[in-house]
A protein has these predicted regions:
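Generic structural signal for well-ordered alpha-helical scaffold segments
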Residues: 3, 131-135, 254
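An alpha-helix initiation/capping motif
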Residues: 12-20, 121-124, 128
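Conserved S-adenosyl-L-methionine
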Residues: 116-217, 222-224, 267-270, 280-281, ...
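Short amphipathic alpha-helical segments and their helix-coil junctions
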Residues: 1-10, 82-88
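Long recognition/docking surfaces used for binding and targeting
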Residues: 18-111
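Short acidic-aromatic active-site loops that bind/stabilize oxyanions
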Residues: 93, 116-123, 239-243
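A conserved structural/catalytic subdomain of Rossmann-like adenosyl-cofactor enzymes
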Residues: 6, 209, 213-360
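Structural motif
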Residues: 4-18, 93-98, 241-242
Length: 360
C-alpha cells in the first residue's frame, strides 16, 4: 500500500512509516482504543489529523525514546487512510507476543537483510546460537553496545525474561527500531539509547562503565575508527591514526563489564592471528579469561561480507588472570547459504531442517 501510494518512498522510509503506524496502534490498544476505526461524520482530513495527533501524543507519553525526526507520520492522506482501513481490522495486543515479534522481525529481516542495509542485521541462526550458549550468564543487566535492530536483545528477553536489557546504538533510526522491536516482543524492562557522538565508543557510554553483567554483540568490526579524541581514550587506540572498531569494542566491553562479567563478541579472525594485532591479544590475555573461541564459516555473513570471523567468549578477570581450559570449535555451516537464504536439508522422511552444525 505504501509503495503504491508514495512513488518517492524506498524500502527504509516505508519501514519507518510501518513502524510508526504499528507504534500508534499498539499504544492506543493499551488504552482500549481502536485508533484507526472511523468516527461518525469524520471526513478524510479529520481522520488524517486525528491519527497524526494520536501519534504525536503517544510519542510524548511513550516509555521509549523516539528521535525528533520520527515525530510525525509522513504518509500522504490517501495512503494513511488505506493503511488505517487494514489496521482497524486487527487487534495487535491480543496476539501472542511470539507471533507479534516474529511478524515484526520478518519485516525487519526483509528491510535490513540481503540489501545495502545488511550491516545492521546479524543472521538469526547466529543470534540464537550465541544467546543459547550464553544462557547461564544471562542475569542482571545484559547489554548489546552495537544493538542494531535488537536481534540479540529480543532473543535474550525470550530466554531470560528477568534480565534488564540495555541497547546502545549510534544510529537514531536503529535505536527507534530496536525499542519498537523489544516493545512488540513484550519486553518491559529495557532501555535503548541513541548515542550519536561516537556510539558506545564515545564519551556518552562512560556512565555505564562497570555496570554490565553480560554483553552479547556483533560490532562493526570491518570499519576503521579515526577520531583522534576517541582513539586516545583507549590503550588499543592511543597514538594511532586509526583502529578497527571491533578491536576498540573489545576494550570497551572490558570497561562496561562488572568484575567477572562475561562477553560474547563476534570478531575478525585477524584479531586472533594477525601480527599487527599482537597488542590486542596481549590485552585480552591480561584482562580476560578466555572461555571459548568458535570459528564461523566464511559464508556466515554473505553476501554482504566475505570475512573470516569467530565468536569470542570471555570473562572479565578480577585480579591476576589465570587462563582456564578454553573451548575451541570450528563451524562448517550455520544454516545460511552464500546468497543469504536459509540452507535447508531434508531427512529420509522428508522433514526439513537447517544445515547447521551449531547446536540447538
Amino acid at each position: 500500500i505504501i509503495r503504491d501510494g508514495d512513488a518517492n518512498s524506498n524500502i527504509i522510509t516505508r519501514f519507518d512509516e510501518i513502524s510508526k503506524l504499528l507504534f500508534v496502534k499498539l499504544y492506543a490498544e493499551q488504552n482500549g482504543e481502536n485508533i484507526f476505526e472511523r468516527i461518525v461524520f469524520e471526513n478524510d482530513n479529520m481522520y488524517f489529523e486525528r491519527i497524526q495527533e494520536a501519534y504525536s501524543s503517544s510519542v510524548k507519553n511513550a516509555k521509549i525514546t523516539i528521535p525528533p525526526t520520527f515525530d510525525r507520520i509522513l504518509l500522504p492522506i490517501d495512503t494513511l487512510i488505506k493503511c488505517g482501513n487494514e489496521l482497524c481490522k486487527i487487534n495487535i495486543s491480543s496476539a501472542n507476543c511470539d507471533v507479534k515479534g516474529l511478524a515484526y522481525e520478518d519485516t525487519i529481516k526483509g528491510t535490513f537483510d540481503k540489501s545495502d542495509n545488511q550491516q545492521y542485521f546479524t543472521p538469526y541462526q547466529i543470534v540464537n546460537f550465541m544467546v543459547e550458549i550464553m544462557s547461564e550468564y544471562l542475569q542482571g543487566t545484559v547489554c548489546d553496545p552495537a544493538c542494531g535492530t535488537a536481534g540479540f536483545l529480543t532473543k535474550v528477553g525470550d530466554v531470560a525474561p528477568l534480565t534488564s536489557l540495555l541497547g546502545l546504538e549510534v544510529d537514531e533510526r536503529l535505536a527507534w527500531v530496536s525499542s519498537l522491536n523489544l516493545l512488540i516482543h513484550g519486553n518491559d524492562s529495557f532501555t535503548v539509547r541513541a548515542l550519536p557522538n561516537g556510539g558506545s565508543l564515545g564519551n556518552e557510554a562512560d556512565s555505564y562503565f562497570g555496570k554490565i553483567d553480560c554483553i552479547i554483540t556483533n560490532p562493526p568490526f570491518g570499519s576503521d575508527y579515526t577520531d583522534a579524541g576517541i582513539l586516545n581514550k583507549f590503550s588499543l587506540g592511543s597514538g594511532k591514526t586509526s583502529r578497527r572498531r571491533g578491536i576498540l569494542f573489545i576494550e570497551q566491553a572490558w570497561r562496561l563489564l562488572r568484575e567477572n562479567g562475561t562477553v560474547a563478541i563476534i570478531i575478525d579472525q585477524g584479531v586472533l592471528n594477525a601480527g599487527s594485532n599482537l597488542d590486542v591479544r596481549q590485552f585480552i590475555l591480561k584482562h580476560f579469561k578466555i572461555l571459548a573461541v568458535i570459528d564461523l564459516p566464511d559464508t556466515a555473513f554473505m553476501p554482504y561480507a566475505n570475512v573470516s570471523s569467530s565468536i569470542l567468549i570471555m570473562q572479565k578477570a578480577a585480579g591476576k588472570v589465570e587462563q582456564p581450559l578454553t573451548f575451541f570449535a570450528k563451524s562448517q555451516s550455520v544454516g545460511r547459504k552464500s546468497n543469504g537464504d536459509d540452507d535447508i536439508v531434508y531427512s529420509n522422511t522428508g522433514s526439513p531442517s537447517l544445515n547447521s552444525d551449531l547446536p540447538d
